[in-house]
Amino acid sequence: NSEGIGVIHIVSDTISINLKPDAIYEFLHGMRLKSYSFDRYKSKKDSKTLKVNMISSKKFNKKIYDKFKAIELGVNYTKDLVSEPGNILHPDEYAKRLSQLKKIGLKVSVYDEKQLKKMGCNALVGVGQGSIRGSYLVTLEWRGKKSNSKPLAFVGKGVCFDTGGISLKPARFMEDMTYDMAGSAVVVGLMKNLALRKSKVN
């Protein structure tokens, strides 16, 4: 319409196939993930809005809804981190943002360059010496089960702006240089998801 707002009504009971209990939530989840856009620094944002009304005879299940909402928040947080330009999300800022995840129940430990040297993490420190920014190792912990349960561990590399090693990358690849921290961003999004869902895992 003239206001840039579209409305869709979906009546799930008219679908002539047997749907599993969380199929409706999966459908909405997919729509929300598809609607992601990183427009934080755009002066003119897309004003178009799509409102979806899901009509069903089945009772609303908040537990299932919250599960998919937590997944969405984790995925989109990862996308936000990867999409940030290198002059904004440098190692100092990245470590600062990860520290803020304490608010959702994660245990966050940040080790700076001085501590890394004591720990013998010389390869990590060596890579970081190519930047005026600090080097950090950040651990995120979620304990949703008994303390004696075996933990799952995920490791991700977080080079915020990778210009190359022995050979510098040409300028035409500059927009991709922030993607070298995507591995760590995926781990961060996963940990946020686990914490928001109160997952029974360590």
Model features per residue range: what roles?
Residues 1-160, 173, 193-197:
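N-terminal hydrophobic/helix-forming segments and targeting peptides
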